[in-house]
């Protein structure tokens, strides 16, 4: 059974990876609204709009405020994307626009970690707990927000640690992040960052 995740990363303005200037991780959020469950247009609000804005911002269709409110700037970014994708540029995310957005994403492998490591210090500060939502990456700055999608669930988490250290694996999710996504094993994921 193939498992796909959607990932979006937007770097922080203070993205140092070490020393005293490591940014505090933003709160992680688990969202059960799937991008594409409804048509999105100016005036729409919610976590699916936030995910749309994250995807557009990550691919330089912004600048956008990623706030979950489909405003004029979001509509303009959607129209720019639609024009480049050869779609009708109406600023509405519906059945034609959604698959084109998903086509932007590359497939990467993800694992998860946690049991046996709880209580250990993480590279970006703090200690790993059973409830810690986050992701390890080899090079993204600490605090970078990453949005994952799997099985109808979105989870936005910060980069909190370094890794993975297995060949061919791009992302190492904490066990809590994997649970929030319903991910039980090493999986191939779709990524955008």
Show the residue positions of the predicted features.
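N-terminal export and membrane-targeting signals
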Residues: 1-2, 16
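Primarily auto-inhibitory N-terminal propeptides
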Residues: 3, 33, 37-38
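C-terminal region of N-terminal signal peptides and the immediate post-cleavage residues
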Residues: 7-34
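Charged, low-complexity, helix/coiled-coil-prone segments
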Residues: 19-24, 85-90, 115-124, 175
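Intrinsically disordered, low-complexity, compositionally biased regions/tails
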Residues: 19-23, 36, 40-41, 47, ...
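Generic signal for short, ordered secondary-structure residues
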Residues: 28-35, 56-57, 61, 157
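Secreted/periplasmic proteins
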Residues: 34, 48, 99-193
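Short acidic, glycine/serine/threonine-rich helix-capping segments at coil-helix boundaries
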Residues: 39-50, 54-99
């Amino acid at each position: 059974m193939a498992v796909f995740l959607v990932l979006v990363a937007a770097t922080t303005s203070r993205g140092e990876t070490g020393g005293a200037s490591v940014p505090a991780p933003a709160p992680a959020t688990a969202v059960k609204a799937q991008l594409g469950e409804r048509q999105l247009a100016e005036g729409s609000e919610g976590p699916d709009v936030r995910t749309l804005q994250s995807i557009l911002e990550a691919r330089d269709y912004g600048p956008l405020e990623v706030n979950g409110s489909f405003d004029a700037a979001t509509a303009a970014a959607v129209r720019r994307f639609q024009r480049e994708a050869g779609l009708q540029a109406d600023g509405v995310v519906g059945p034609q626009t959604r698959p084109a957005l998903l086509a932007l994403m590359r497939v990467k492998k993800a694992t998860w970690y946690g049991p046996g490591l709880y209580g250990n210090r993480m590279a970006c500060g703090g200690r790993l707990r059973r409830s810690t939502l986050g992701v390890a990456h080899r090079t993204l700055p600490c605090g970078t927000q990453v949005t994952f999608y799997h099985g109808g669930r979105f989870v936005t988490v910060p980069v909190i640690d370094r890794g993975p250290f297995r060949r061919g694996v791009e992302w190492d999710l904490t066990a809590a992040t994997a649970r929030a996504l319903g991910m039980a094993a090493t999986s191939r994921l779709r990524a955008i960052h």
